[in-house]
Regions:
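A short N-terminal helical cap/helix-turn-helix that marks the beginning
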Residues: 88-94
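GIY-YIG nuclease catalytic motif and its immediate N-terminal context
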Residues: 1-39, 53-84, 95-96
Length: 96
């Protein structure tokens, strides 16, 4: 049976939408790796979406984190509705 490695799931709302996307949901092994991972996203390293968002000059910020594994991250992505989970969007009345 596969072991589910617990880590940190994070939600990044974009300053403005990129095509259909207004958020990115990601995962890291532990909170220790979160800030370096965000730095990598800012540098355009890693997820293709974050690379093109950066190339388009679109900023982002960390809105929320959850404890969880890769399976939970994938489930959240499949469910959609990142703007409903995003405290920044809810506060601003913004919908992706």
């Amino acid at each position: 049976m596969a072991t589910h490695v617990q880590g940190v799931i994070y939600l990044l709302p974009f300053d403005r939408p990129y095509r259909h996307a207004s958020h990115y949901t990601g995962w890291v092994h532990s909170a220790t790796f979160l800030q370096p991972r965000l730095g990598a996203h800012r540098d355009g390293v890693g997820a293709r979406l974050m690379q093109v968002v950066g190339e388009a000059g679109i900023g982002f910020q960390l809105a929320r984190t959850w404890d969880g594994d890769r399976y939970r991250e994938r489930a959240l992505k499949r469910q959609g509705g990142a703007s409903r989970r995003c405290p920044i969007c809810r506060q601003q009345g913004r919908r992706g």
